[in-house]
Amino acid sequence: MTLRYICKELGISKRSLQRKFSIYLKSAPKFSIKKNQNAYLAIDGTYFPGDLCLVLYYDSHIKYTQLYRFSDKERFSQIKEDLLNLKALGVEVKAITCDGHRATLKAAREALPGVIIQRCLVHIHRESNIWLRKRPINQRSKELKAIVNLIFNIKTHNDKLAWIKLFQQWFLDNEEHINQKKINATTGRWWYKHKDLRRAAIMIKKALPNMFHFLDDNLIPKSTNNIESYFGHLKDTISIHRGLSRSNRKSFITWYLHYKNQTRR
């Protein structure tokens, strides 16, 4: 939908429509938090031009954005503060689904000790496949890629145990290989010889304890897809309004979040 289309539908000029928009953009709406004794949060950040990062705290079960923050990136201190504020305002977080960003993991553990953290399976699958390549040549990479691609088939605890056993056996068989190093004889500097394969394997190994909590509670989202689709639509919408200043872009996003929440009431 373009400005030209909206003007045609409303029967007004582009300048008149822009004036109406500017009135809204000058003052962002107030955000309200819904008390929830069993909140299942999905937390994720996305980036816009001009070093603008939007961090969203989405209550998955009630489909409501409880809180948002504008920043330059996902920061531990800010996310921790946000989680503490949510708790103080009556949002009792039972579980958090996130992509594994260090700032989010650390903030969740410090602000909400004992909270269940579910790692986003879509993120693990996507990142692993990026590092392992679309068509890996190395046999070890092919094997790990095949294991990773089974993630979405896990529906039961037996499936989980079988998958974990498969991955752990692969890791045991290939640990020496993925830890091989190259050393520069002149400088003494070293690096991992199979860097990308190692990155994929270590990421999965570290995430493993928090990959399958959704099997114990079906209200726990196993991915942050709900937020990512949210972000996708937001970016499509804001792309129509090119040329917004940073402050107007923030105001536009706030109005978008506000109206999305209104539809959930």
Region spans (language model):
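Inter-helix linker motif
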Residues: 112-136
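Acidic/histidine-rich catalytic cores and adjacent linkers
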Residues: 94-105, 112, 142-265
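Short, amphipathic alpha-helical "recognition" segments used to contact nucleic acids or chromatin
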Residues: 1
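RNase H-like nuclease fold core
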Residues: 9-102, 106-114, 207
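Residues within the helices of the helix-turn-helix
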Residues: 4-8
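Helix N-terminus capping/helix-initiation residues
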Residues: 11-13, 75, 120, 156, ...
